Amino acid sequence: MKSIVVIEDDAITRALLQQSLRRDGWRVLEAEDGETGLNLVVENRPAAVLCDLHIPRRNGFQVCRMLRAQPDLAGTKIIVTTGSRFGNDRLTALEAGADDYLVKPVLPADLTRVLPNVAADPAPNGQVATPPTANDAIELTNTGLFKTSFPDDSDLRTVVRFWGVRGSLPTPGPTTVRTGGNTSCVEFRCGDQIIILDAGTGIRGLGSSLAKEFRGRDLHLTILISHTHWDHIQGFPFFGPAYSPTNRLRILGYESAVGGLRTALFEQMETAYFPISLSQMAGRVVFEELEDMRFQIGPVAVQSVFSNHPGICLAYRLTTPGGVVVYMCDHEVYLRQERLTQERAGKPNAAAIEFARREDEKIARFIGPADVLICDSQYDEEEYPSRLGWGHTCMDDTVALALAAGVKRLCLFHHDPDHDDAKIDSMVAHAKELVTKSGKSLEVDAAREGQEIVLKAVKR
């Protein structure tokens, strides 16, 4: 009997795929994460693999590359099944070794089309396939050593400060002075714990501030990277504390669609682009590539989810004794993207609309009744159609998402380079009108450089 490994973390999708495949005579082996899936493939040598892109513990791009690095598995067909409509993701998956790319929801006819002539499982040829390992030569720290609970005496303030609020590229000048022109960087503190969300150009000013505050003292902090697009890492070479030998920096993030976290930061500091290499930074810089979707940083419990953005991009939910802050910097709401895509193609698909709606509901559940939501709001309704599939959200959808999730305070974030202070003010005014029409309660403002939000711990 032909066997197939299905690597999918969504239980509903996994069950539907299993039902369809078994009806067609397949022996189905299931995995909820990439690491388990890789082991199943090595142990069972299936005829085919169905793999989502957005899975924990080795994303789908990694799975494709690792399987294709195994000569003994050359006959195994790899089919990516994903909710991502982004053209770059399709191209990257095929370059990583996928044989086909199916956008969810995957129907039985889709499976029949891509699996018509797959032979029975490859016969052993005397070689033993070994478990794949990452080809990026980085020694990773064991991230399982994080604490898993708050301290009993949880009397800690949570402070959020914005140092960079712009998307895509820096936009300095007199027309952006009130909002700010630096790219993504948010300082997050809980007690003595310092977490920096992304390393856009705003991190330079934050570094100068920290250097003054900690003059004569060692500085220990964590930089949490959402993804490695330029506007989220371009400020790191200018982060002053990284050049002090007494400071320790932990840089956390997930492997991207094309390589490791350290590699991405290293390459932008190569000689062709920057005069100082990463190895010349005197600070103790430790890279930790995350695999699990839940982890702990001191007293801060962190949960992550894949956002709808080209490549691998994560949103973070940070829970402290003072409350919950969600950082979703780059995200395109699924339903509007799907509706407009279908409208342009002239091909209505009710199943795809329902799938998009369900994906948006999953994101809303992840956000939950957060105290603060920092969320992508790059376009207005007129701009969005010409930027369909760029991985950013229409502000109206951001407000709707916050209302559905029961958020207390929404900070519009990742402002478009073409949006000056006046434009952003008008978007805030429109957002408040939407809240009023909904009849619900939600505080809305634009994230602005220098702005500070304080959440005080509730004593029990």
Predicted segments, located by residue:
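Conserved acidic carboxylate
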Residues: E8
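Charged docking surfaces used in two-component/phosphorelay signaling
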Residues: A15-R23
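The feature encodes the CheY-like receiver
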Residues: P56, A74, F86, K104, ...
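C-terminal output helix
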Residues: V106-L115
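Binuclear metal-dependent hydrolase catalytic cores
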Residues: A123-T341, D421-R460
